[in-house]
Amino acid sequence: MFKNAFANLQKVGKSLMLPVSVLPIAGILLGVGSANFSWLPAVVSHVMAEAGGSVFANMPLIFAIGVALGFTNNDGVSALAAVVAYGIMVKTMAVVAPLVLHLPAEEIASKHLADTGVLGGIISGAIAAYMFNRFYRIKLPEYLGFFAGKRFVPIISGLAAIFTGVVLSFIWPPIGSAIQTFSQWAAYQNPVVAFGIYGFIERCLVPFGLHHIWNVPFQMQIGEYTNAAGQVFHGDIPRYMAGDPTAGKLSGGFLFKMYGLPAAAIAIWHSAKPENRAKVGGIMISAALTSFLTGITEPIEFSFMFVAPILYIIHAILAGLAFPICILLGMRDGTSFSHGLIDFIVLSGNSSKLWLFPIVGIGYAIVYYTIFRVLIKALDLKTPGREDATEDAKATGTSEMAPALVAAFGGKENITNLDACITRLRVSVADVSKVDQAGLKKLGAAGVVVAGSGVQAIFGTKSDNLKTEMDEYIRNH
C-alpha cells in the first residue's frame, strides 16, 4: 500500500511541474507589464500584462493537462480528454449548483461558490488519466469501431466529468468554504504563522520530492485580488504579479536560497579535509552559484541531507523562519519559479523594501555559515570531503551516461517507469535491491531517495536530458 501511495504521489509531484514550468514566462510578462515602468511604452506594458494574465487565468486548465500527461506517459490523447473533462465539469457545476444551493447563478458566480480553481483542474486531469489508463485499448462492436481505443477516452472522460460535476455541486461548497477560510487566515489574518509553517514543511518534503504538491495551494490558491479590468487572481504568485499590495508573502525564499544555502555550501567547503578541499570547493561553489542565480537548492541540500540530518533539520527551521522575517519587515518581491537572482531582479516591479534583502540576507548567510561550520567540526559530521575513505568517481562521458544509469537502476527489465522533474530522475523499479545507489552517486547523483518501489536520483537541472537519453537507450537496446 505504501509503495503504491508513494509512487502515485511521486507522479502527482512530477505532473505538477509541467504547469509550474510555464510560470516563469507568464510571471515575467504579467509582472513587468503590471509594473508600468516609465521606460516601457504603455501599449507594450498592456500587451505583456494581458498575455501573462491569460496564462494565470487558465491555470486550472493547464493543471488539468499537466496532471493527465503526468499519469499517462505524456500521451496527447489524455491532454485532450482533460480539456474536455474540465470544460464539462465546470459547466455541469454551473447548472447544478444553483439548484442544490437554492441561490441565483449570478450570486454563486460572484461569491465563487462553485469555483474549484486549480484543484478542479487537478481533479479533471485525474479523471482523464484514469480513463486513459483504463480504456485506451478498449474494443467496441465493429459498427462503433471508429470510437474504439484512444478515441473512446475523451468520450468516457466527458461522461465521468458530468457525474463528477454533479457530485461536486453537493460537496464542493463546504469544501470551498473551508479552503476560503484557510485562505483568508493564511493570506490576511495570520500570514506570519501560516507562511512560517509553509516554509518549514516545504523543506521537509524536499527529500521525498513531494514539495510541489504542498506548494500549489500557497502559490496558486490562497487570497483573492481583482484588478482594474475586473480580472480575479488567486494565489500569492498571480496576485503579486497582478499588483496586489498584500501579496508577496513567499519572499522569504530569497533569504535562504540566495544567501543562506550558498553560505552553507562555503562552510562545507571550508570544513573539508585539506587534501579534498580543492575538489569539494569546485562542487560547492558550482552548487552555491546555482542556488544564488536560479534558486535551485537540491545540489547543496542533498550534499548534507543524509550524512548530517541534524543540519537539514536546522536548515528547515531557518527556511521556515525566513518567511515571517520578511513579512514582519515588510519585505516583498516576486517569484515565478524559484527564489534566485533572476526572479529577484526581473520581478521587482511591485516589490517593497528591496534594499533590505541583501542586508538581511547577509545576516542570514552569517547564521548559516556559523551554524554549519561549528556543528560540522564539533560533531565530526561526514559532509563532502570529510569522509573516512573516499573513492573517486570515474568520469563518464555524456554518451556513456545512459547505459551506465540504466545498469545502475538494475537494468531495463527492472525499470517499470521512467520520468524526471527539474532536478531529479524519478524511477519506479520492480526490485529495489537491484538498484546500485553507490553507482548512481559515482555517476554524479547528489543524493538517492528510495521509498517503496520509487527511486529518485538527484542530478540537478540535467535530469530531464538524462531521462531522455535513458529512454532512447532503453528503446533501442
From Swiss-Prot:
It catalyses: N(pros)-phospho-L-histidyl-[protein] + D-glucose(out) = D-glucose 6-phosphate(in) + L-histidyl-[protein]. Residues 399-477 form the PTS EIIB type-1 domain. The chain crosses the membrane at residues 15-35, 51-71, 80-100, 112-132, 152-172, 191-211, 250-270, 280-300, 310-330, 356-376. Residues 36-50, 101-111, 173-190, 271-279, 331-355 are periplasmic. Changing I422A: Still allows binding to Mlc. The modification Phosphocysteine is found at C421. It is found in: Cell inner membrane. Changing C421S: Unable to be phosphorylated and to catalyze the phosphoryl exchange between glucose and glucose 6-phosphate at equilibrium. Remains susceptible to CdiA toxin from E.coli strain 3006. Still allows binding to Mlc. Changing I458A: Still allows binding to Mlc. Its main location: membrane. Keywords: Cell inner membrane, Cell membrane, Kinase, Membrane, Phosphoprotein, Phosphotransferase system, Sugar transport, Transferase, Transmembrane, Transmembrane helix, Transport. One of its GO terms (molecular function) is protein-phosphocysteine-glucose phosphotransferase system transporter activity. Its EC number is 2.7.1.199. InterPro entries: Glu_permease_IIB, PTrfase_EIIB_Cys, PTS_EIIC, PTS_EIIC_1, PTS_Glucose_EIICBA, PTS_IIB_1, PTS_IIBC_glc, PTS_maltose/Glc_sub_IIC. It is a multi-pass membrane protein. Transporter activity may be inhibited by SgrT. The active site is at C421 (phosphocysteine intermediate). Residues 1-14, 72-79, 133-151, 212-249, 301-309, 377-477 are cytoplasmic. GO terms for cellular component: membrane; plasma membrane; transmembrane transporter complex. Changing C326S: Destabilizes the protein structure. Residues 1-388 form the PTS EIIC type-1 domain. Induction: Induced by glucose. Expression is positively regulated by the cAMP-CRP complex and negatively regulated by the Mlc transcriptional repressor. Mlc and CRP-cAMP bind independently to the ptsG promoter region, and the action of Mlc is dominant over the cAMP-CRP action. The ptsG transcript is degraded under conditions of glucose-phosphate stress (due to intracellular accumulation of glucose-6-phosphate caused by disruption of glycolytic flux), or in the presence of (toxic) non-metabolizable glucose phosphate analogs due to hybridization with the small RNA sgrS (originally known as ryaA). It is an enzyme of class 2 (transferase). Changing V449Q: Interaction with Mlc is hardly detectable. The phosphoenolpyruvate-dependent sugar phosphotransferase system (sugar PTS), a major carbohydrate active transport system, catalyzes the phosphorylation of incoming sugar substrates concomitantly with their translocation across the cell membrane. The enzyme II complex composed of PtsG and Crr is involved in glucose transport. Also functions as a chemoreceptor monitoring the environment for changes in sugar concentration and an effector modulating the activity of the transcriptional repressor Mlc. This is PTS system glucose-specific EIICB component. It comes from Escherichia coli (strain K12).
